[in-house]
Amino acid sequence: MKKQRNLRSMAAQAVEQVVEQGQSLSNILPPLQQKVSDKDKALLQELCFGVLRTLSQLDWLINKLMARPMTGKQRTVHYLIMVGLYQLLYTRIPPHAALAETVEGAVAIKRPQLKGLINGVLRQFQRQQEELLAEFNASDACYLHPSWLLKRLQKAYPEQWQSIVEANNQRPPMWLRVNRTHHSRDSWLALLDEAGMKGFPHADYPDAVRLETPAPVHVLPGFEEGWVTVQDASAQGCMAWLAPQNGEHILDLCAAPGGKTTHILEVAPEAQVVAVDIDEQRLSRVYDNLKRLGMKATVKQGDGRYPSQWCGEQQFDRILLDAPCSATGVIRRHPDIKWLRRDRDIPELAQLQSEILDAIWPHLKSGGTLIYATCSVLPEENSLQIKAFLQRTADAELCETGTPEQPGKQNLPGAEEGDGFFYAKLIKK
């Protein structure tokens, strides 16, 4: 039996690690969830994701409610108060229970002397909630995005930035990819229906299913047997452009965690696939996905800027480059991105993408296809990146995705209920 732990203090410490230390929630949360009971796993996730989604609002409220900020060793208390405010604002947890558990969190973080302070701040919010929220909603903080990102979105999308921001602040739907080597989408949907769940097929992507209500993977029919994989609809769109064929040599570059690697093999089971990623730790997830789906690929650790180190002079029929990016298209799925990224990261990422594109292009066969993809919505990483590449690369030709002046296809967050995603299809003359 799991030891009873204070979930509010655990959430506060996790959020603090993201905001103050720049750690990714996807690395922090799973080990924490192993320490709590199954019924508490979902609440811990809700508290962490929710606080990060609404962080700027909670921070704004604390600055109004407290004379001076908590600093030094007491900084965790700042995040504990955030957890308390989030519960009062956004959950169905009875206010008395939210207050009691949050105040007790002070004991768990060894700050019992601050229980009175935490209780006082949260009760003050309850008394002043209406006036405070009215003032907040009239401020720029109401968009729940850092100012640098808001400015970039406003510049890139003067007519659409508000809808992008709104989509980023929503809870994401759960999309699945049916493994066509096991089941047709319709036959798997019938199994889902028998299991008491409902799913909806995507209009354009033949393997994509949206669950009516997100569910743990272990309850999905045949998940452990590889019948279905969790993957957003926009990410599944890569295969429509890549169009892999049996017998081809295909490179999946920046492949971890392996969702697109396995999708290639579902579409073309006899393709010779090489999956490469710079992060050796994340490559373990590629192996896990291949094993669960019963598939084989050559998996290598390597830097996309130096392909000769891991593939020599080899050339490929098709290359999928899912480039390292700001991930500004998947904020609704990973709200910590808003607080992990900095404005200065964007030109650095654009430079890295440019170097990888230039380095990998010679490894594409004449007549071959390269799909450049990101989960970003920023032009510097997307259309401007491809426009510059086409201008300096004489044997590269844009195909089916946009125009030379506005290259690529940009999906915005929430469009057709998918994530923000960019694709450009390039052919080597």
UniProtKB/Swiss-Prot annotation:
InterPro entries: MeTrfase_RsmB-F_NOP2_cat, MeTrfase_RsmB-F_NOP2_dom, NusB-like_sf, NusB_RsmB_TIM44, RCMT, rRNA_ssu_MeTfrase_B, rRNA_ssu_MeTfrase_B_ent, RsmB-like_ferredoxin
Record-listed S-adenosyl-L-methionine binding positions: 254-260, 277, 303, 322
Classification via SUPFAM superfamilies: NusB-like, S-adenosyl-L-methionine-dependent methyltransferases
Reactions catalysed: cytidine(967) in 16S rRNA + S-adenosyl-L-methionine = 5-methylcytidine(967) in 16S rRNA + S-adenosyl-L-homocysteine + H(+)
Listed EC numbers: 2.1.1.176
Record's function text: Specifically methylates the cytosine at position 967 (m5C967) of 16S rRNA.
Stated name of the protein: Ribosomal RNA small subunit methyltransferase B
Organism: Escherichia coli O17:K52:H18 (strain UMN026 / ExPEC)
